[in-house]
């Protein structure tokens, strides 16, 4: 809160000996928070899969994580007492955090600064930034996105079909389309946020090499609601 910076702290000794995923503990999570954390899990799996580099295990985990989210997120939001839906969502979330050892990308780079400076929920900001970052990266991720469409068995198995799936999912979850719906223009520090986004640890995992100008234009598109 004092610095306005979201830091990542990690050490091998932080790793637990065992992890128990108990869906019963998530039953009381309100629908809005279930939606936001579910979109966060989607962002983890999606960016891990699109990150450059060779990591077939992470790719496989990420694909299956996205399939589970596609099947179970809306049910978990609309019927929070459905233990099967909760179990599959907590599993998908765990899979995403396993897969992103491969890398993340600009969705997270843009999110972390607004989380720290503007106090916007991380999953909510990831959901907002997702289609803008995807369309910005289109020329280098289109083949991977089509593979995701095939695995999820989407009706329209194209890049635009995937974008429409993301937009439709957000709409069904009652999530905002534009960053300006959650941050007022007067509170939006474009230069500061863009610099922070470029310096974010997630930036190195983006499929395209990014500049501060790239961060600015992605923020601007996210504020206006204009896809690339």
Predicted features, each with a name:
Residues 29-31, 53-58, 131-133, 160-162, ...:
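A ubiquitous short alpha-helical element
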Residues 104-161:
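C-terminal catalytic subdomain
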Residues 145, 149, 153-228:
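C-terminal charged capping/lid subdomain of soluble metabolic enzymes
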């Amino acid at each position: 809160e004092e610095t306005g910076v979201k830091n990542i702290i990690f050490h091998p000794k932080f790793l637990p000996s065992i992890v128990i995923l108990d869906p019963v503990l998530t039953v009381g999570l309100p629908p809005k928070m279930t939606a936001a954390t579910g979109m966060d899990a989607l962002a983890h799996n999606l960016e891990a899969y699109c990150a450059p580099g060779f990591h077939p295990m992470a790719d496989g985990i990420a694909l299956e994580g996205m399939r589970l989210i596609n099947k179970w997120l809306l049910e978990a939001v609309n019927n929070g007492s459905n233990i099967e839906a909760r179990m599959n969502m907590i599993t998908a979330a765990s899979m995403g955090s396993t897969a992103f050892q491969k890398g993340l990308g600009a969705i997270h780079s843009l999110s972390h600064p607004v989380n720290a400076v503007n106090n916007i929920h991380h999953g909510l900001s990831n959901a907002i930034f997702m289609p803008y970052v995807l369309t910005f990266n289109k020329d280098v991720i289109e083949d991977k996105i089509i593979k995701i469409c095939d695995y999820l068995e989407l009706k329209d198995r194209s890049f635009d079909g995937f974008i429409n799936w993301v937009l439709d999912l957000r709409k069904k979850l009652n999530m905002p389309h534009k960053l300006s719906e959650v941050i007022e223009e007067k509170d939006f520090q474009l230069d500061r946020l863009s610099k922070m986004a470029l310096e974010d640890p997630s930036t190195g995992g983006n499929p395209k090499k990014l500049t501060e100008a790239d961060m600015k234009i992605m923020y601007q598109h996210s504020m206006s609601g204009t896809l690339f």
